[in-house]
Amino acid sequence: MNEQYSALRSNVSMLGKVLGETIKDALGEHILDRVETIRKLSKSSRAGNEANRQELLTTLQNLSNDELLPVARAFSQFLNLANTAEQYHSISPKGEAASNPEVIARTLRKLKNQPDLNDATIKKAVESLSLELVLTAHPTEITRRTLIHKMGEINNCLKQLDNTDIADYERHQVMRRLRQLIAQSWHTDEIRKQRPSPVDEAKWGFAVVENSLWQGVPNYLRELNEQLEENLGYKLPVDFVPVRFTSWMGGDRDGNPNVTADITRHVLLLSRWKATDLFLKDIHVLVSELSMVEATPELLALVGEEGASEPYRYLMKKLRARLMATQSWLEARLKGEKLPKPDGLLTQNEQLWEPLYACYQSLQACGMGIIANGELLDTLRRVKCFGVPLVRIDIRQESTRHTEALGEITRYLGIGDYESWSEADKQAFLIRELNSKRPLLPRNWEPSNDTREVLETCKVIAEAPKGSIAAYVISMAKTPSDVLAVHLLLKEAGIGFAMPVAPLFETLDDLNNADDVMTQLLNIDWYRGLIQGKQMVMIGYSDSAKDAGVMAASWAQYQAQDALIKTCEKAGIELTLFHGRGGSIGRGGAPAHAALLSQPPGSLKGGLRVTEQGEMIRFKYGLPEVTVSSLSLYTSAILEANLLPPPEPKDSWRHIMDELSVISCETYRGYVRENKDFVPYFRSATPEQELGKLPLGSRPAKRRPTGGVESLRAIPWIFAWTQNRLMLPAWLGAGTALQKVVEDGKQSELEAMCRDWPFFSTRLGMLEMVFSKADLWLADYYDQRLVAKTLWPLGKELRDLLEEDIKVVLAIANDSHLMADLPWIAESIQLRNVYTDPLNVLQAELLYRSRLTEEQGKSPDPRVEQALMVTIAGVAAGMRNTG
């Protein structure tokens, strides 16, 4: 065990040493000494030395304004380097990869050992695999794209240094490159100067495809194919690619006025342009590789006399010319020029697939399978995974925007006010219009700007090439009319196909009503005819947790999914559950494998569709090797969940969960909504107000510019509590409820639930993870430095509650310390704490100075403001999840 970590620790200390040399070269010995002193004090304070803890506080409080930024940057950059080393460790032969026998192989062996499963059943489950990852631009990806690129390069250096056969002069070269990269990072500003636009966010998404997924996906499929051949004697069909990517960047307009119909149109074009760019590179390689002469009569007929001497190359060159023509046309469109479509414009995947597949079949038939299964196979699989659109886009809009648009239309037509009608009247009107042959929209009508925007967006969907838009998600969906309204607006825009429209249920009440809403919809004949046996429903994790606390929210999510699965099964509808999980626990994040196996039985039959958010995209898909490992984890979890579904919970367990849910929700809301001191405490004990200044995402932090906690988006709400280490949204209410049930004499029942029910054990595991990252003395320090004395009792009460909660969870899980079953994560948190602690203390100090300046009516000191931004980014890196 320790041998594994020693490789990680030595990489971390080596990177730290190089960073130290860089700081010394840039700023002189005295700053490096200052940083080193703070690091040593922090280490000793972590080990329990109280005197050194006090000295640490004094040292950081006494830093001059000139020293603030260098010290903050030193610890922040160190944490980025530690994260890079850790990411490398997860794929290095000396690290996790060594102790982690191939995850898919392990799952296949486990499945083969089940007496009631045969190879044919397993093969069928593999063939129905479907994984759709939806990349979202959450404002939580704090690290700039330029630094992410440098971190990737550092990773390559670590890989080269791991090679035992490396010659001395090569080692010196790699070390020199490492020093250059770390120096470049040090001399780069880590905080963006302005907010990214939605187009910038989309480009960030394309960069992930280019730098990692493009290579990672074919590698993952090779890995999967090898394991299936070895364990089942089964080869993946060439056209079988179970994974696809969709993006919300440029399509998600919920609460983001910056995402307009024009932006979506632009991003769709940009995405196609990027696809032609990447496929051109592939085809360029194939033109040079496929110089073979021998071909089947079919292929020779396809190329004619002109291409007979080098048939494969001839076809590739023709495809290259089409790609280039398509790219030029897209470039002109992006510049706003209106050009006629050229001959051979690529708009559908088949146009790419056919010439490539013809070459593949011919090579196979002529005994050149080894060549066919090289670069050509990788490109074919990319066509299936990415294709002409590169990534498909989801459109997301809030339900009230559709209601308001229809209200405006009905008022203009003089048939009443749609907004004030009852649900029954709305449904009757919508179904009548959906069945009508005449258009609803009047010809020369001038809608308001908001309504025009909604109608324009529907037009973009209707005009986009088929297959480039994946789904229309309705946030804050509450009623059947919310879904029918979108279908009507799409019909009016002239859409020629049935677009999947997914209601998103995200508050506690909406989750509890989800089954009822879907049952009503499925009872409408017109609707049943439209959806052709398929329905997608999105489950919101972050808003329900913010509304009711994690325990009540996770039980409501479980029950909603369970009820929807059963309703759709009965109705003969294939249900795809779309999970809107976040990276952090308060937004539903959990290690993928555990999270999937803790869902209700049958929840993955329709495949898995899940959001991958902000900073999690980098941790899970930042490098091709990490991509392979993340996709393999998902694959094995889906196979296992479908073939060895978790048990149906006993009725007594359901009753206990109902009880836990009620108590925890009351406790949570008792503080967050009903305690008059809570909002002022939250505003002063966390950097919530200052977070608004960080130029993170393109989306405003609040749904409405004024208002309390309820109007805050779920992400800043969680981000703020992560910064002061109280981690409140991820645990408040849960432990109190567990304690109450234990006092009622049900501890042994809770222990059984923990042992035998993945849903419950995952909940406790997630609480342990949060408790490991929370820190009482730091949360206390924020209070002392920033909070009015009258509010101190509330802070103390919350910290006492946290301490109690930790004891309760450990007792139920029968563990002596947190994270006993995941030592690797515990180790990683401990490793980072030494560097995160000084940033937290410094942040409290900076918040104090910044607020004092504001109170005195002076203008802010740019050194303080800049250092504050760096500590926020640094703590986020230390916690490995922002919001």
Curated annotation (Swiss-Prot):
Catalytic machinery residues: 138, 546
GO MF, one annotated term: magnesium ion binding
Family of this protein: Belongs to the PEPCase type 1 family.
E.C. code: 4.1.1.31
Catalytic activity: oxaloacetate + phosphate = phosphoenolpyruvate + hydrogencarbonate
Keyword S-adenosyl-L-methionine set for record: no
GO terms for biological process, alphabetical: carbon fixation; oxaloacetate metabolic process; tricarboxylic acid cycle
GO cellular component: cytosol
Keywords: Carbon dioxide fixation, Lyase, Magnesium
Keyword presence, Lyase: yes
PANTHER family membership: PHOSPHOENOLPYRUVATE CARBOXYLASE
Entry superkingdom: Bacteria
Name of the protein described by the UniProt record: Phosphoenolpyruvate carboxylase
One of the Pfam families matching this protein, by short name: PEPcase
Cofactor(s) the record lists: Mg(2+)
Function according to Swiss-Prot or TrEMBL: Forms oxaloacetate, a four-carbon dicarboxylic acid source for the tricarboxylic acid cycle.
Species of the source: Salmonella arizonae (strain ATCC BAA-731 / CDC346-86 / RSK2980)
